C-alpha cells in the first residue's frame, strides 16, 4: 500500500501540474508497491500503469475521488463530482487492431507505448517540433513489419531508419496508424453532471489518469 512517503511525492507532483513529474511520481510509487517478480514498470503499457496505480491508490487512501468537472454546455461552470475507483475501467474500442494492413501483402504490427517511451517522447528537452515528436512516438511503437514470407523487426532498425520508412507511407496508410493510437485502450469513465446555473444535464467522458485528479 501507499506509505506517507509515496503519498507526499504524489501530492507534490500533482500540485506542480507538471506531467513529467506526475509520471515519475507514479512510476516511483508503483515500484514501491508492486511485489511481483519480473514486472518492469517501465515496460508496461501506459493504460496498464494508470489502471494499476489508480487501484493501488484506491485500496490505500480511499476508494472514491472528488473531482472538479467543467460543464460542457457553457464551458466554464465547474461542479464537484464523486467517482468510485472500481467503476473506472480500461476501455478498448471494438475497431482497435494492432495489425495494420499496408497493402495486399504487407502488414505492420504495432505495440503499445510504455511509460518509458511516453516520458521520452513527450518530455524531451530538445527543441523537436510537434511533427518530429509524433513521428518518434509512432516509430517507438512499431513492433514488426511482415508478409507471408518475411518479417522485419523494429528492434533490428535504428530510430532514423524507422522514421525514414514512415515517411515513405502514403496518406491512407498513415491514417491507419493514427487510428491505432486513437482507438487504443484508455482509462475511461463517463459521468453525468448538471450545470447549477442552466440546469442542463450533460455527459462528460474522462480519459487518462490526470483526469481523475482534477
Where are the predicted features?
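Short, surface-exposed, charged amphipathic helix/loop patches that serve as local interaction elements
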Residues: 1-214
